[in-house]
């Protein structure tokens, strides 16, 4: 158990450096962001220069920057990845989040390593192995319950990180191959085609339709607001928000929401602290209901629930705001529970489909009543009857508040002024205990009005508005009240604040790679199937080093050509439609979890049910045209057809 075992880390996502800065200002203790490559999010990469500028910004608040390098790597990518890791280390980032074990075999600087959720950490054995092999922090599978989390926490000394909010992958992370099988875009390489958000028809083993054209693999969004205390007790110390594709207002809002929640718990309990410095003040009221979500679930943290899926629509409908009274040619009359504004996004559900429109103009027509003129009148609106429920998925005024400065974060500093007529001595001590002393020589006379002079000194020293500090305490220990001209005092204070900045950055300590345990750990299995995602020689060497004998290639290597589980998930469609043998009354033997089918257009997937661990396997086969494509990540794959043509030998004559 480390010294910091009482410190809680709120970890926010950032698509880019601008969002990362705002996440920190809104209260994140750490931010995870993609570097220039291998970041498992197609289109969310950032230059080394941007990351190098972000690092000191974060470190001034004691906040950390984690870079995601969590794709599986082709052999041709190992050298570029090794160079990139060296460059990232030089920018000063705090840690790398990785999936590919080959990275541990590369010749890289001693950067702290975190195991990505893509490593599929569900068991004590695997968690302990990863902790023993050099991972400081491990991101557990989102499907775990409190008991499983607690067991892993008790068995390892790694910091436990857990997803508390955002989109849920329906499959175990790292155990989903459907995107690659159908499109050649590998989820393990950050290019998921999101087959789970498509509509499917479910059929039983007799071919009978159980459910028609629903989003049967689409999960609601994760929201652990109600479970934070229980997760802390189970050993979670890093609370992760999903969303490296999400926009600025989402990250501001959700970060602020959890900052306030965690601060309240820290305040109440007394034995916990936040993992970085400063206090955060928000200039808006955070609401998880007002930015994009697909409904909320706490997934399996407490127990299996029947309502984890968002089958009707993966779209965002927002909050109920009232009902539609009447629809006219170019406007509608509505009764509301909340005031409306021009620019609001409103919607109704018609036969489970979301029919949405922007309010071009709204006019109050009475007590809680408005007339709304949409930008474009949806044709389907005329189908609805009076008193049809109305939702708002874009609250214009609330969103506007988020586009402005919506938060401030300041670090506490204690100020002490001492000295005598010939020299003033100013000491600034930050809340972390970093202290600097600055002196000002001169001939300072006794002031005529002692009380006024003392107040002037106090106020002048506490003026920290332009810095990231606030004065927690100001002490003046002078033999008498001295007169110091304001211009001199201001410059003196500004120089001292700059010195404190430099001293705090210099005293910042980043982590480093954890040494491998002695004796070296042994991997819990001796044979790895394609589910282990071993895609390069270095990853093979890693597993051989720790006792694995037989290693099958990753799915992306195109050696699994037949029917295999392209998704393994805790989400069970038998359970969702009350067809689970475990729930059946009467003679259990007569109930078998026979296979079912999911159909989307020409695409037919078989569902098999593994009832002991309570899992569903989605069985599919890689498409033939994908087998003909170059392997993802290989040099060949990055060459365009035009460039290939140029390599043909020139015709003579």
Q: What are these model-predicted stretches?
A:
Residues 2-26, 30-33, 37-40, 54-55, ...:
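Surface-exposed amphipathic alpha-helical tracts and adjacent flexible/coil segments at the periphery
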Residues 43-52:
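Aromatic- and glycine-enriched glycan-recognition loops and surfaces
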Residues 94:
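Short, conserved active-site loop motifs that form the nucleotide-linked donor/cofactor pocket
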Residues 102-109:
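Short active-site loop/helix that positions an aromatic residue
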Residues 117:
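Residues at the C-termini of beta-strands that transition into short coil/loop
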Residues 122-126:
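Short, glycine/polar-rich helix-capping loops at beta-to-alpha or helix-loop-helix junctions
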